[in-house]
């Protein structure tokens, strides 16, 4: 019997030692130590053992109870379903420091007081990762080429700088060092100027025109007079300004080269129809309205397929937009149908003093059932400034042919006619006399040797040949009795409607219904 009591007492001592080891582990964890394996598990010193033995002296053999049944082999916790292990049923034990009760093990740090940190250690700020503060990550974007080339720190600015610009190249980097290295490597290989870093607030992403993008001046801040008036909290928003009133020769050459070099990559809102000397733009839905306006002013558009909200043509002349709206509401009586604008135009002509001649347009509006754009191919651009007059003559001849073909169409409705623009659509009824007179008046006004803003003998010669082929006569008072017209071999060369196109667009058009005559 005595041996059993000794064994039970020895077991109790071991349990107390185990509790002390657990208390040390909890204290080490509270002090920030995460390496439990480095904590040496050794027996208590003889002094602590004596304290334990002295504490056990208060227990009698009758107070010793057997260890409750465990839930599984190897587990150190008792069965939670047995009420005998609840803290209120266990007797207090005496440790070397204070009287501890089993309920202390349910408190934070098992009831062991944690020493306060000194003031010197409190001035050391915790790391961001330990304090839970999120590290903001900034990406950097290098726009290698284009009108807004540079290094950006904002994706919104980068997207605005590259959207709608054909052939632009850009890439994302994690650090400014990588972005700068990539930009310097590109500029060195291309032998161009070093790219600048453009912060978010300093990016100028909406130049007045595509052609002037490379030379757009930096944005000037408004200077406010503060004497007697309060400065507004923010600069007033500028009014919507689309383009300069006149297109320059540099603008035209920029758009001309853009059309010749466009291969269809990077922009699915347009494609080109390429001839031997010129490439014309075909704009689809969601095309950039500013580029549509500039190409219209340059006479370099063949077809426009606008969206239902007509956002692509919002910068075209107001009377042209109104004619399109009337066609949808009064002619076809449906604003949801897809339509097209087929344009035949001349190109501008310049002199040393500036712009001499603005393009003249004949525009056909109709309902487009199907558009199959062909693949755009990059063409060789060899045009020089001295070649612009020859190109203007060629487009002028094609314009005259398109205008004369209206005489063969018996069912036409004139939507709008102005000094240099005629807008018409097909009709299911015969052309009324009012529309016929409008077409004839427009033809008499523009079909002359002064079509391009100056007397051109080549244009006179072309008109003479075309009219005589139809059985008519033509004389020009600028030419000596109509016989001193320059017999230019280049004007006689080529097929009936200019150079043969290298590819064409396939489209099916529906004939719109009739409507009453619209008064402009």
Curated annotation (Swiss-Prot):
It is found in: Host cytoplasm. One of its GO terms (biological process) is regulation of translation. It comes from the Viruses. GO terms for cellular component: host cell cytoplasm. Gene3D superfamilies: Ribonuclease H1, N-terminal domain. Pfam families: Cauli_VI (PF01693). Keywords: Host cytoplasm, Translation regulation. Residues 487-520 are annotated as: Disordered. Enhances the ribosomal termination-reinitiation event leading to the translation of major open reading frames on the polycistronic viral RNAs. The inclusion bodies are the site of viral DNA synthesis, virion assembly and accumulation in the infected cell. Belongs to the caulimoviridae viroplasmin family. This is Transactivator/viroplasmin protein. It comes from Cauliflower mosaic virus (strain CM-1841).
């Amino acid at each position: 019997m005595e041996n059993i009591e000794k064994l039970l007492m020895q077991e109790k001592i071991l349990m107390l030692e185990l509790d002390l080891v657990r208390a040390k582990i909890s204290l080490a964890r509270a002090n920030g130590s995460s390496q439990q394996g480095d904590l040496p598990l050794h027996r208590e010193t003889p002094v602590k053992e004596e304290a334990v033995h002295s504490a056990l002296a208060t227990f009698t053999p009758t107070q010793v109870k057997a260890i409750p049944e465990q839930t599984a082999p190897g587990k150190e916790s008792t069965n939670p379903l047995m009420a005998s292990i609840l803290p209120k049923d266990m007797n207090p034990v005496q440790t070397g420091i204070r009287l501890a009760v089993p309920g202390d093990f349910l408190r934070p740090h098992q009831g062991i007081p944690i020493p306060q940190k000194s003031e010197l250690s409190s001035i050391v700020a915790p790391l961001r990762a330990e304090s839970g503060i999120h590290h903001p990550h900034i990406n950097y974007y290098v726009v290698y080429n284009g009108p807004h080339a540079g290094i950006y720190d904002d994706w919104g600015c980068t997207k605005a700088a590259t959207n709608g610009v054909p052939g632009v190249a850009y890439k994302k980097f994690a650090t400014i060092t990588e972005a700068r290295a990539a930009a310097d490597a590109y500029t060195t290989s291309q032998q161009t100027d070093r790219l600048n870093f453009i912060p978010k607030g300093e990016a100028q992403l909406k130049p007045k025109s595509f052609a002037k993008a490379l030379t757009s001046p930096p944005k000037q801040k408004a200077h406010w007079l503060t004497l007697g008036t309060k400065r507004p909290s923010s600069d007033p928003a500028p009014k919507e300004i689309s383009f300069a009133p006149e297109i320059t020769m540099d603008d035209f050459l920029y758009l001309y080269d853009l059309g010749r070099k466009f291969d269809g990559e990077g922009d699915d809102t347009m494609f080109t129809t390429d001839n031997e000397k010129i490439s014309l733009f075909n704009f689809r839905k969601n095309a950039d309205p500013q580029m549509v306006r500039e190409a219209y002013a340059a006479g370099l558009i063949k077809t426009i397929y606008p969206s239902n909200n007509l956002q692509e043509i919002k910068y075209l002349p107001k009377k042209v937009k109104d004619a399109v709206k009337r066609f949808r509401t009064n002619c076809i009586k449906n604003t949801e149908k897809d339509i097209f604008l087929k344009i035949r135009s001349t190109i501008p002509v310049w002199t040393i003093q500036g712009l001499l001649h603005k393009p003249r347009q004949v525009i056909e509006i109709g309902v487009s059932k199907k558009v199959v754009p062909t693949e755009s191919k990059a063409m060789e651009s060899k045009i020089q400034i001295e070649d612009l007059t020859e190109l203007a003559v060629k487009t002028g001849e094609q314009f005259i042919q398109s205008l004369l073909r209206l005489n063969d169409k018996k069912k036409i409705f004139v939507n709008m006619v102005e000094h240099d623009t005629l807008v018409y659509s097909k009709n299911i009824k015969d052309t009324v006399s009012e529309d016929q007179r409008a077409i004839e008046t427009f033809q008499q006004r523009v079909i002359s040797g002064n079509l391009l803003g100056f007397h051109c003998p080549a244009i006179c010669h072309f008109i003479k040949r075309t009219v005589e082929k139809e059985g008519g006569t033509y004389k020009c008072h600028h030419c000596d009795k109509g016989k001193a017209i320059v017999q230019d071999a280049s004007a006689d060369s080529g097929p009936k409607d200019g150079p043969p196109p290298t590819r064409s667009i396939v489209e099916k058009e529906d004939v719109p219904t009739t409507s009453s005559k619209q008064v402009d």
